[in-house]
Amino acid sequence: MKRWEHYEHTADIGIRGYGDSLEEAFEAVAIALFDVIVNVNKVEKKEVREVEVEGEDLESLLYNFLEELLVIHDIEGLVFRDFEVKIEKTEKGYKLKAKAYGEKLDPEKHEPKEEVKAITYHDMKIEKLPDGRWMAQLVPDI
């Protein structure tokens, strides 16, 4: 079961996602990212975007995934509420393919909160927890 949360980090907002699999943790942290931007519970799954990124390690894969979502948000004005992520190991590291579900930003409907300027490696952790679940976290630049 995937879930996400925000956590206190000085003047910033940390985002953290949990999942039964690595993919679910990536999905959950992406939801947490968009919940920093808007109220994701008010976003409907009207449009889908496909994302493909690579990374030499899991940290760069997560960074590239979230950065690509932020680029789509900035260019197309879309906000997302759900994701389907597939990760595979490659000779050069990892490859991620995802579907992102959401709709055009409507300030009246989605209740904009913060502007995320960039994804960062600040406080980034990706780990398998003792209970077998996965956790992914970082602090984006607000």
From Swiss-Prot:
Domain of life: Archaea
Organism field: Pyrococcus abyssi (strain GE5 / Orsay)
Residues holding Ca(2+): 12, 141-142
Keyword set includes tRNA processing: yes
UniProt key word Metal-binding: yes
Protein name in the entry: Protein archease
Subunit structure: In solution, exists as a monomer, trimer and hexamer. Oligomeric states form a tripartite complex with tRNA and PAB1947 methyltransferase.
Similarity field: Belongs to the archease family.
Keywords: Calcium, Metal-binding, tRNA processing
Function: Activates the tRNA-splicing ligase complex by facilitating the enzymatic turnover of catalytic subunit RtcB. Acts by promoting the guanylylation of RtcB, a key intermediate step in tRNA ligation. Can also alter the NTP specificity of RtcB such that ATP, dGTP or ITP is used efficiently. Chaperone or modulator of proteins involved in DNA or RNA processing. Protects the tRNA (cytosine-5-)-methyltransferase PAB1947 against aggregation and increases its specificity.
One of the protein's GO biological processes: tRNA splicing, via endonucleolytic cleavage and ligation
Pfam families: Archease
GO MF annotation list: calcium ion binding
PANTHER family per record: ARCHEASE, PROTEIN ARCHEASE
